[in-house]
C-alpha cells in the first residue's frame, strides 16, 4: 500500500525505516535507519554511518529500497537492526525475510 505523507522535516512517532540493498555478490542485506524522513515531494533523507555494510553496498551497486517497519514484522525488523551483515551475511534469511 502506498501513502503520501507529504514533506515533513521530522516524523513522529519515530518510525523505523528498513533500508535494503544487495552486496556485490548479490547477497541481500537490510538495516534499520531511524534517522531519516521525507524531505521533499519526491525525496527522502537517510543518515547512515559509513561503517555499515549497507553503505558499502549502496555506493557500489547504486541501488537501494526504503520501507517502514510495521507491527506485524517487529521481530524481523529488530533482528536486521541488531545483526550486522559484516558478521552475519545471511541475516535476512535468519530474520525470516525472503527476497
Where are these regions (language model features)?
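Active-site-proximal mixed secondary-structure blocks
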Residues: 1-31, 37-99
Amino acid at each position: 500500500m502506498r501513502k503520501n505523507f507529504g514533506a515533513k522535516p521530522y516524523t513522529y512517532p519515530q518510525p523505523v525505516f528498513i533500508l535494503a540493498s544487495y552486496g556485490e555478490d548479490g547477497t541481500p542485506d537490510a538495516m534499520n535507519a531511524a534517522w531519516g524522513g521525507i524531505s521533499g515531494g519526491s525525496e527522502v533523507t537517510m543518515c547512515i554511518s559509513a561503517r555499515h555494510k549497507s553503505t558499502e553496498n549502496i555506493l557500489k551497486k547504486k541501488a537501494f529500497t526504503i520501507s517502514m517497519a510495521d507491527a506485524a514484522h517487529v521481530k524481523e525488523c529488530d533482528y536486521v537492526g541488531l545483526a550486522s551483515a559484516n558478521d552475519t551475511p545471511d541475516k535476512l534469511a535468519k530474520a525470516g525475510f525472503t527476497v
